[in-house]
């Protein structure tokens, strides 16, 4: 697994160098080329902020630290350190590659604590335009989750996760929607398959402040949840940290948080408090 991750990272960086060396100054350092390429891609896209839960159709370069606190109806708290978040890098004009390290899961119950599954994904920008060209973005994402979890803290087998995401911005508001699936590579009878449909409305109310409300729906086919559906409403807030000396060449830090609130009769947990620290570069 470690060797595979190192190979993937090496290939991505080689692709990035090949894609950017022809357009950016050879006198720039790798970090300067990295940030300059990100600015070039951002100029082709609308101004969104990545949803707390749902997929982002834009190509972005980022690193995220995320912690989730899930609470069941009996009051049991499960803490997920990592929460399926990691880092991403833009390669060329149309691709983003992401790596999600295994999260650490603390159950606060009789279940064994341990590490969950690692994952990778590739995002392809189908079409996009900034506010001068239509203010929209459409992307296809293909993820692969590796069954690396310990003590049953992950899936029984690997799985693929295709997702279609799109967004449209209008003045200080935008709407983002995505539809995706989790398709295990084996043991379908026990694991089942699922479809996730996320819809997000965002408002950029102040230069440093965004608010959003998400609807997170999951539909299950096969497995222990066969035929069931769960839904969460997720309000969230984002604060962009930029000092007076901030420049476009500097990284941007974002502090954000929100709460998933169960609104369906069936749900695997009642509430999920999510907090994050993001760095965009």
Across the structure, where does each feature detected by a protein language model lie?
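Cleavable N-terminal export/targeting peptides
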Residues: 1-34
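Transmembrane beta-barrel domains of Gram-negative outer membranes and organellar outer membranes
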Residues: 22-281
């Amino acid at each position: 697994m470690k060797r595979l991750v190192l190979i993937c990272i090496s290939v991505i960086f080689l692709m990035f160098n090949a894609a950017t060396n022809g357009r950016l100054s050879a006198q720039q350092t790798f970090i300067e080329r990295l940030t300059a390429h990100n600015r070039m891609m951002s100029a082709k896209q609308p101004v969104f902020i990545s949803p707390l839960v749902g997929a982002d159709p834009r190509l972005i370069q980022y690193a995220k630290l995320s912690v989730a606190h899930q609470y069941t109806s009996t009051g049991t708290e499960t803490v997920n350190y990592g929460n399926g978040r990691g880092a991403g890098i833009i390669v060329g004009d149309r691709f983003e590659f992401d790596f999600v390290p295994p999260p650490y899961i603390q159950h606060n119950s009789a279940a064994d604590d341990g590490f969950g599954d690692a994952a990778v994904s590739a995002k392809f920008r189908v079409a996009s335009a900034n506010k001068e060209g239509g203010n929209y973005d459409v992307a296809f994402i293909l993820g692969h989750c590796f069954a690396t979890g310990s003590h049953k803290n992950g899936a029984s087998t690997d799985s693929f996760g295709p997702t279609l995401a799109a967004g449209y911005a209008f003045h200080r508001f935008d709407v983002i929607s995505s539809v995706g699936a989790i398709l295990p590579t084996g043991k379908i009878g026990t694991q089942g398959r699922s479809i996730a449909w996320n819809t997000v409305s965002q408002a950029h109310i102040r230069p440093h402040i965004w608010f959003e409300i998400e609807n997170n729906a999951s539909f299950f086919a096969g497995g222990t949840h066969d035929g069931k559906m769960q839904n969460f409403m997720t309000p969230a807030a984002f604060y962009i940290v930029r000092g007076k000396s901030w420049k476009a060449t500097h990284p941007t830090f974002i502090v954000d948080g929100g709460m998933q609130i169960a609104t369906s009769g069936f749900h695997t947990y009642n509430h999920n408090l999510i907090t994050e620290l993001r760095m965009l570069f």
